[in-house]
């Protein structure tokens, strides 16, 4: 499956006019625009919780001014991409598995093969391309919402917006943002591809589609955590993760 998918994705770059862009748009709308409310809500809560818990610990050392920069780094590097990917695993991966699983049960996938069409090229590629598009956008949206939530939370500890902003700008680099977006793109591939794979592996029977959807969610989350762990190790080995540039924000 992985080899066929990689080959068909490369084929789609060479033959964009033959991609089913209608399915791509439908998948992008369902996975992206329809997910904005839940991603925004969860990201806001994550921003509040993360900064609040960090502030409790930092208050013991009189370093509450570090909460903003550290929260922003945690959101951009880890929490933004990870939470967004898990939410999409619960929504889109299950939806893709259910859609393709229903087609498998109804022998529509077999009909494509009989007609000389590639199910991966016909069904999977548009959904994977949609995942590649929407995941970085949703992650950037989640980062912004979470950071704004952290800003409001820090007001309760007497840290003005300008202090939070100055600390965040000093702490978060373009490399941090790009690292999170690259990770989000990989998550987009994983979530959409796993959902489609589980859909194509659907068996027979009334419960088959539900089982495939459940397996898609579980497999997607496991793969997300695995990819995140590998990405963290690579970042550490290459030296792209460092906190030595952090400085205590000065009061306005």
Which residues does each predicted region cover?
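Core alpha-helical transmembrane segments of integral membrane proteins
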Residues: 1-84
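Start (N-cap) of specific transmembrane helices in multi-pass transporter permeases
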Residues: 27-30, 107, 118-139, 216
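Loop-to-helix entry region at the N-terminal start of transmembrane alpha-helices
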Residues: 30, 34, 38, 63-96, ...
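Hydrophobic alpha-helical transmembrane segments that constitute the membrane-spanning cores
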Residues: 45-49, 85, 125-154, 194, ...
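Membrane-interfacial helix-loop-helix connectors in multipass membrane proteins
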Residues: 52-77, 144-185, 189, 194-215, ...
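Short cytoplasmic-facing helical segments at TM-TM junctions of multi-pass membrane proteins
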Residues: 99-125, 209
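Final/C-terminal transmembrane alpha-helix of multipass membrane proteins
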Residues: 217-232
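Conserved small/polar residues in nucleotide/adenosyl-binding loops
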Residues: 244-250
């Amino acid at each position: 499956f992985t080899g066929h998918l990689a080959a068909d994705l490369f084929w789609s770059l060479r033959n964009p006019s033959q991609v089913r862009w209608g399915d791509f748009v439908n998948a992008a709308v369902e996975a992206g625009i329809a997910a904005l409310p839940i991603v925004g809500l969860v990201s806001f809560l994550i921003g509040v919780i993360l900064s609040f818990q960090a502030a409790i610990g930092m208050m013991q050392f009189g370093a509450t001014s570090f909460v903003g920069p550290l929260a922003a780094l945690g959101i951009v590097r880890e929490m933004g991409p990870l939470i967004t990917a898990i939410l999409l695993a619960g929504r889109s991966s299950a939806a893709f598995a259910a859609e393709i699983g229903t087609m498998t049960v109804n022998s529509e996938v077999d009909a494509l093969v009989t007609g000389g069409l590639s199910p991966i090229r016909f069904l999977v590629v548009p959904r994977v391309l949609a995942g590649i598009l929407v995941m970085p956008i949703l992650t950037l949206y989640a980062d912004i919402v979470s950071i704004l939530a952290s800003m409001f939370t820090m007001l309760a500890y007497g840290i003005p917006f300008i202090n939070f902003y100055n600390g965040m700008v000093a702490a978060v680099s373009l490399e941090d943002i790009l690292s999170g977006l690259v990770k989000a793109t990989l998550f987009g591939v994983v979530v959409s591809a796993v959902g489609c794979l589980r859909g194509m592996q659907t068996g027979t029977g009334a419960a088959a589609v539900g089982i495939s959807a459940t397996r898609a969610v579980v497999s997607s989350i496991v793969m997300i955590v695995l990819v995140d762990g590998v990405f963290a190790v690579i970042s550490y080995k290459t030296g792209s993760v460092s906190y030595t540039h952090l400085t205590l924000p000065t009061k306005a």
